[in-house]
């Protein structure tokens, strides 16, 4: 991805997302006698990030201390706050000054931006070509997107699942109202899907890996077949980005470098803390996850071509009545390489 040319929206840096001290507002570690900022080594700024769990770049960075080292270089430290999951609740937490950094899709980002956001996006990862899509059970008579007519499909409202389904239907020339959308939280959908209470499930790799790895499900259509523009983005609380741009830039640099390493050696980023229990990925599911990650994108700056595709998604959501109007996504983007 090429860096953004100056965007008019970026002139208002105060509208950008944040990383701040643990508590109600940005603050330094009072034990160090700091002034709230990372400069001058007087205080340490605390960055609140959802706990990454057992896999991924942040999980390994948490374990080996490399993330602490990268943040310490700019006078910051991480506080693991809550757990990683769907973007909508994370966006609400950033708006309420309870979280500073979160990861989500452009689709869930757009719906969250339609609700008085206090955050902005500062990185982009290309749409997942193979790890997201529409799942059907093995043995299902659903052989094409057109076979979804009259069926029930589980989706997360306003997020990746609803986008993938609507995009697939539009591509097949099927009116959206000819397929019943069943709105469910993704972490509550597997049991419903496997019990046959829905016919298909539009979802991303976090949940698809276990289903495909079990041998009980397959993708009817993946991201490539659907023509997905569903980028993964990192968001930062706006006031934090305004006050501590150098920390946002350092976090980006860490994510960029290590996401490239993860793509080259996916297995090294799995089962970081344990290879047993519900957070571990083993057997066929591990093979599936490694294959997905090897084809995934890296964490990059947001470039002009990316913005065009974001705008396409925003227009599509407005046309499909997912959002009441087209969200001005460009007003909530940060050129991370120009922060200083």
Positions of PLM-derived features:
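Pocket-lining segment of extracytoplasmic ligand-binding domains
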Residues: 107, 181, 187-276
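Bacterial signal peptide processing site
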Residues: 23-26
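Periplasmic-binding protein-like
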Residues: 125-136, 217-240, 248, 252, ...
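Bacterial N-terminal signal peptides that target proteins for export
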Residues: 1-10
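C-terminal motif of bacterial Sec signal peptides marking the signal peptidase cleavage site
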Residues: 17-21
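Short, glycine-/small- and polar/acidic-enriched structural segments
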Residues: 29-175, 181-183, 199, 228
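Conserved C-terminal helix/tail region of periplasmic/extracytoplasmic solute-binding proteins
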Residues: 314-340
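Secondary-structure end/capping motifs
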Residues: 242-322
């Amino acid at each position: 991805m090429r860096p953004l040319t100056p965007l008019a929206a970026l002139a208002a840096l105060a509208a950008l997302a944040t990383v701040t001290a643990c508590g109600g507002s940005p603050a330094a570690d009072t034990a160090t006698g700091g002034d709230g900022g990372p400069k001058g080594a007087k205080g340490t700024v605390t960055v609140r990030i959802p706990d990454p769990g057992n896999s991924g770049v942040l999980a390994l960075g948490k374990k080996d201390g490399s993330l602490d080292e990268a943040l310490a270089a700019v006078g910051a430290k991480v506080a693991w706050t809550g757990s990683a999951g769907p973007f909508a609740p994370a966006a609400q937490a950033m708006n309420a000054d309870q979280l500073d950094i979160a990861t989500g899709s452009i689709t869930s980002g757009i719906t969250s931006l339609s609700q008085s956001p206090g955050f902005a996006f500062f990185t982009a990862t290309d749409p997942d070509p193979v790890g997201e899509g529409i799942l059907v059970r093995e043995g299902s008579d659903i052989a094409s997107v057109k076979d979804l007519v009259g069926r029930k499909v589980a989706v997360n409202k306003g997020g990746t699942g609803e986008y993938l389904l609507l995009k697939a239907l539009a591509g097949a020339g099927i009116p959206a109202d000819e397929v019943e959308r069943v709105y469910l939280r993704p972490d509550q959908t597997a049991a419903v899907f496997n019990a046959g209470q829905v016919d298909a499930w539009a979802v991303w790799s976090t949940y698809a890996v276990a289903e495909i790895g079990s041998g009980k499900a397959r993708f009817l259509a993946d991201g490539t077949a659907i023509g997905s523009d569903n980028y993964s983005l990192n968001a930062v609380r706006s006031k934090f980005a305004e006050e501590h741009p150098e920390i946002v830039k350092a976090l980006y640099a860490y994510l960029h470098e290590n996401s490239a390493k993860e793509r080259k050696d996916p297995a090294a980023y799995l089962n970081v803390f344990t290879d047993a229990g519900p957070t571990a990925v083993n057997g066929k599911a591990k093979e599936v996850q490694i294959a997905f990650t090897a084809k995934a994108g890296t964490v990059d700056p947001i470039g002009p071509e990316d913005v065009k595709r974001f705008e396409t998604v925003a227009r599509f959501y407005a046309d499909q009545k997912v959002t009441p109007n087209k969200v001005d996504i460009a007003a909530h983007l940060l050129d991370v390489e120009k922060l200083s």
